[in-house]
Amino acid sequence: MESAPIVLDNGTGFVKVGYAKDNFPRFQFPSIVGRPILRAEEKTGNVQIKDVMVGDEAEAVRSLLQVKYPMENGIIRDFEEMNQLWDYTFFEKLKIDPRGRKILLTEPPMNPVANREKMCETMFERYGFGGVYVAIQAVLSLYAQGLSSGVVVDSGDGVTHIVPVYESVVLNHLVGRLDVAGRDATRYLISLLLRKGYAFNRTADFETVREMKEKLCYVSYDLELDHKLSEETTVLMRNYTLPDGRVIKVGSERYECPECLFQPHLVGSEQPGLSEFIFDTIQAADVDIRKYLYRAIVLSGGSSMYAGLPSRLEKEIKQLWFERVLHGDPARLPNFKVKIEDAPRRRHAVFIGGAVLADIMAQNDHMWVSKAEWEEYGVRALDKLGPRTT
């Protein structure tokens, strides 16, 4: 294990890191960097307050910190802060000497080329890695499922990508980005709870509401029925105990919260909802490959974990096909096949696919961009990673 390639999946909300062959990330922690609001307190409880707090450490004392997310919508926006996160990853968590090691990094589709170049430059020049490979997250999610073609719906904390892939090649001209994801759903749940009189306004409360969302929220299959149930019965009502011991009642908010994925206007976005986005993406593909895409709609990322999401997507995509392609003719509907791949481990699908790929590549030095190639060719060395969008 000591010499195995490192697999690092940088997400907007969480960093996932481990080694080739691992079935799960060794470590997962929030992608946050915090600095104390006041320097007066040196210690709180048994946590030492430092000038820069990162990841789990920052999360533990979040209310005392000015918190920054170095990544937005899946893309690194602040490399200075990102270096703090990477230092924490390699030296505090993995406790390794990165010099001469191999590392597989992940990137979103449509990641700006300059970003990939800066990321690789940092790995070679700041940390001294011997080999670097950058893989597109959606392709790794497919590999985790043992597939090479399909539409990956990768919904994390900061962004949802809809990525059609055919025979391991991303169809870049069709990649879609829906700027509604986990963080938006959490904010929306905060506003729904506020209407009930429960105020969550501190940064520390955000984490509390996120956990509540993950435990209680689900995607409604039939909105009218759920609305009726919440209005006329207490079937949907759940008690939830907050960290300070208070108990609150959560009812209709359980299904209203994830609804922002299907109705983005609820969180101020003018984009189409998730089902329509997927349908439009596949319909824009070449007619010969559409059937392969419909038969492998692969869910990936933490915001795809809601109970009820796969069946709602299937129902709405079939409905869209019925209305827009068949124009309401039910005779041909049985020939239309949709399959939603909802693997139980899809929260970590990108990491799992990365660990599989890094293991296959471990003994094939020519597949990695080496430090020697970087020193000789500079950013041109990255051409061997294959064509990428600019």
Swiss-Prot record:
Cystine connections: none
Pfam families on file: Actin
Domain of life according to the entry: Eukaryota
Swiss-Prot/TrEMBL keywords: Actin-binding, ATP-binding, Cytoplasm, Cytoskeleton, Nucleotide-binding
Residues reported to bind ATP: G156, D157, G158, R210, E211, M212, K213, E214, G301, G302, S303, S304, M305, Y306
Keyword ATP-binding annotated: yes
Record GO biological process: actin cortical patch assembly; actin filament branching; Arp2/3 complex-mediated actin nucleation; endocytosis
Family annotation (InterPro entries): Actin, Actin/actin-like_CS, ATPase_NBD
GO cellular component: actin cortical patch; Arp2/3 protein complex; cell cortex; cell cortex of cell tip; medial cortex
Subcellular location: Cytoplasm, Cytoskeleton, Actin patch
Single annotated GO MF: actin filament binding
Keyword Nucleotide-binding annotated: yes
Family: Belongs to the actin family. ARP2 subfamily.
Function summary: Functions as ATP-binding component of the Arp2/3 complex which is involved in regulation of actin polymerization and together with an activating nucleation-promoting factor (NPF) mediates the formation of branched actin networks. Seems to contact the pointed end of the daughter actin filament. During cytokinesis it colocalizes to the cortical actin patches until spetation is complete. Has a role in the mobility of these patches. Essential for viability.
Subunit structure: Component of the Arp2/3 complex composed of arp2, act2, arc1/p41-ARC, arc2/p34-ARC, arc3/p21-ARC, arc4/p20-ARC and arc5/p16-ARC.
Protein name: Actin-related protein 2
Species in which this protein is naturally found: Schizosaccharomyces pombe (strain 972 / ATCC 24843)
